[in-house]
Amino acid sequence: MDSTMTPEPKEPQGPWRWLMDSEEVSSSLLRSSIEQFASLEAYTSKYGDMVDMIGYPYLSRVWQVDPNGKPYSFQQRCLVITDVHSPYYAYTIAKLPEYALIVTGVTAPNFGMEGGAREVRFIYGGELLTVAECAELGILKGRSLS
């Protein structure tokens, strides 16, 4: 191409393609797997009280940890590659204030990864809470990994 030619613009292609909401997916969760709990006891009797996250407390997603303490893999969480250097946090769900909800569902496959991790989010007064806000409200308590 000579210097007088201008290349045709191309559709922007970011390094990651986030899942769009669809009939099958809502906010990166499989719609068929989404459950909502207004009771901590109802949630913990089904899934336990241990959660963790890869990322920073200003984010709002944590993942369920199995009763033996085994966390989901990076691929099951469908995290972007830059999260490989993000910190790891472990928590116990300690309480659920009145009018708060736990919303949980299975992560949909994305970024060429399998998905399948059970993601957990906390809603209070209709607002999605960050992990830092959950800690301030006493919903989440840090736990030791030993």
Please place each PLM-identified region on the residue numbering.
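ADP-ribose/NAD+-binding catalytic cleft of ART/PARP-like enzymes
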Residues: 1-80
